[in-house]
Amino acid sequence: MRHYEVMIILDPNQDERTVTPSLDKFLEAIRKDGGKVEKVDVWGKRRLAYPINKKEEGIYAVVELECESHSVLELDRRLNLNDSILRTKVLRTDSK
């Protein structure tokens, strides 16, 4: 299994208190495949470097997880299908 870090930018109109529960729905796919979610860090609302879908701000969240590559690809696919998610970035990190 490999370590990954996923940066997610969500729609700023979403309530920040609902970010973690809504991300848990997507992260359940990682847990079902035998991976584990190590940390979910919600940074809150921040200004974007450039507008995305005519939005100047976004809610940033960083998720650290350990899973197989096919699991993280499925997670990224599901996140990109959701309208409330503006952008995602998946990075493979070094083992801890």
From Swiss-Prot:
Superkingdom to which the source organism belongs: Bacteria
Pfam families reported in the protein's UniProt record: Ribosomal_S6 (PF01250)
GO molecular function: small ribosomal subunit rRNA binding; structural constituent of ribosome
Keywords assigned by UniProt, alphabetized: Ribonucleoprotein, Ribosomal protein, RNA-binding, rRNA-binding
InterPro entries per record: Ribosomal_bS6 (IPR000529), Ribosomal_bS6_CS (IPR020815), Ribosomal_bS6_sf (IPR035980), Ribosomal_S6_plastid/chlpt (IPR020814), Transl_elong_EF1B/ribsomal_bS6 (IPR014717)
Family the entry assigns: Belongs to the bacterial ribosomal protein bS6 family.
NCBIfam families: S6
Protein name (Swiss-Prot/TrEMBL): Small ribosomal subunit protein bS6
